[in-house]
Design a protein with these regions (language model features):
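Intrinsically disordered, low-complexity terminal regions
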Residues: 1-177, 182-185, 194, 202, ...
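Short beta-strand segments in beta-sandwich/barrel cores
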Residues: 199
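P-loop NTPase nucleotide-binding/switch module
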Residues: 189, 206
Length: 276
């Protein structure tokens, strides 16, 4: 063959090799993302919850905490297309409806007047989705329902990106904490404490609304349908808040430390009073 023919054949072979290598790399890099998407079956089950005053939805973790720490950092389970409806029941006990596939890993623990729902995934799940190497698992739990006795005074939701809705609640005092967002609707509280998360309110009546500005990322009130008496704001940092027109009748600022400050943006005429 001519020298030019050898050169052309070499270029063709090199091209094939480059294409094969790039295809292999693309396949390898796409595998972890595809294998880290956990879609649970839609079949559900229900477990009974004991009478309690405090309810905790504990963080998802493994029996072996070392599996949560890979060379690339701490692993996490992040929910998507997962929501929780929270409602009261006129009974001494409640219930949780969730995917049947999670039943072997879910337990209910009681300590005094506190009820804790714990989801402890086995080591096999972490290895299957390569979480022993670090990273994030996207999990789809679908729609779930949490029914709690009306006497519950505190609800902590510690599943990341769990979208929750609390409705038809009427009580003297309720404290809420979430790692994501909570929509409150058709409820009435004497005292409502928002300690962490994002919150929206629609058709809600609250005489005293307590908001921790250090931990509450945002809150929105549908002024046309809500009735809020006094908003008690507190924090230990520098905060900036906008009070919507008709959001509440009174705002009170309670700094936790001397260095804390609050800048308010008002959308209507107001009277500012400084106590002696």
């Amino acid at each position: 063959m001519k020298k030019t023919t050898y050169i052309l054949l070499g270029m063709v072979m090199t091209g094939f090799i480059i294409i094969a290598v790039m295809a292999g790399l693309a396949y390898c890099f796409s595998q972890p993302a595809a294998s880290r998407h956990w879609v649970l079956d839609k079949q559900q089950t229900t477990v009974a919850l004991p009478s309690c005053s405090v309810f905790f939805l504990q963080p998802i973790h493994s029996h072996n905490d070392e599996l949560l720490r890979g060379g690339r950092g701490r692993s996490r389970i992040y929910l998507e297309r997962s929501d929780l409806a929270i409602m009261p029941v006129d009974a001494d006990s409640g219930s949780l409806t969730f995917p049947l596939e999670l039943k072997p890993y879910l337990s209910v623990v009681t300590q005094g007047d506190t009820c804790m729902v714990c989801l402890d995934l086995p080591d096999e799940v972490y290895r299957k989705y390569r979480l022993d190497q670090g990273g994030t698992l996207l999990a789809e739990f679908g729609h779930m329902e949490l029914k709690l006795p009306a006497g519950v005074q505190q609800v902590d939701l510690n599943w990341e990106n769990l979208q929750s809705e609390l409705h038809s609640w009427q009580c003297d005092s309720l404290s809420l904490q979430s790692l994501s967002s909570v929509d409150l609707c058709r409820s009435h509280f004497e005292h409502l404490y928002l300690r962490q998360g994002r919150f929206t309110m629609d058709e809600v009546k609250v005489n005293h609304l307590w908001i921790d500005l250090d931990e509450v990322y945002d809150w929105k009130v549908q002024a046309e349908s809500c009735e809020i008496g006094i908003e008690h704001l507190w924090g230990s940092q520098q905060h900036h808040c906008q009070i919507q027109r008709g959001e509440c009748k009174e705002v009170r600022w309670n700094p936790v430390v001397e260095e804390a400050s609050l800048t308010l943006s008002l959308q209507q005429s107001a009277h500012v009073h400084f106590p002696e």
